Amino acid sequence: MQSAALGVTANAATWQGRYCASTAAVRDAGGRMWAPDAAVARGGQLVRSSAAVAGTSSPVLYQNQRQGPVSFAIPVPTAGTYAVDLLLAETGGAQPGQRVFDVLAEGTVRAPSIDVEARVGGARADHVVVAVLVTDGRLELQLRPRVGVPAVGAVDVALVSSTATAEHTVFDDTFAGPAGAAPDAAWQPQTGGRWGGGAELQAYTARASNVSLDGSGHLALTARRESYTGPEGATNSYTSARLETGGRLSFRYGRVSASMRVPAGAGYWPAFWALGDAAGGAQWPSAGEIDVAELIGQRPAAVDGHVHGPTATGTAYGSGYERTAPSSLALGFHTYSALWLPDSVTFSLDGKDYGTVDRADLPAGQRWVLDQPEHLVLNLAVGGSWAGAPDASTPPTATLLVDRTTVARW
């Protein structure tokens, strides 16, 4: 059960504690209550702002802040790993370099030199999210100043795992094997020619010409311009590949990564993502989806990370971020990752975070459903509503090379 006044769930299996810089409980846009932080905060002073904070539907969680050297001692029900989500915004007009602080958890620096203005700009929601191993009944957090005074609007803490173990890899595929061989049995090919509501041009096959190991430690998913009629009788103008780990590898929460070299070319749409195990048929989007990396060939320097879920009326929503690299991502291998925790998904490129989709920021009516097991998907689509159609410059073949995929948990 949940106490609306306290903002704390009492069920240890799904325990959460939500605290905000306020003298009274606050309700976010999704209807969840956040308790005043006085019971857990030490130091700092409450500062109120009327700044219009962008990037969130719950600006009150960012407008009121605790500023100054501050620490938190948060009681937790059991030893284990906890997700810590700090809700931050620069509402005081500080310029880059004028408010810089370290975030420590359990005495260890977990996020050094946080400068919210430099990260996202002024009056915009930002998040520092870490997974913390707690071995006793209290989670210790500290915001330690480097320049100026730290400022935090709210703290969200959630139990991830009651197993008191450090982050460790539970799945690691380096795609070793001879050229032309099928990938590990964890990856199962999906076949057929009706995808993307009929807007995509490819038929997915299990042929080695579309999906196989390359003999050099890579998985190759290759799209080919060719007429192909599949068993269902549909004829498509391209073939390609889609692999899923459903029924073989599923997980709830973790850090998922892939090192990939993506293709360029108008109309090509490589993606690495996670799909809810119950997503078949009409159950999408209710089962949830995390797009770790989506790229389109005509914009090869940009990568997008998104989450998808249902609205209160049953339609789908998408929320995410885009990162533009200094040069084309098709020129070499890059690591695309997502840190999935109970109330957030943080996307990164080559180890640098570029955006967090957070439950606290969703508008009313957008449901957060990312609390059930998901499995991995790798695919290379052609065309569709987002990628657009190939054109005269599009090469007739394109290959998504995957060097490694990993899943880490606690």
Segments (PLM) and residue ranges:
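GH16 jelly-roll
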Residues: 162-410
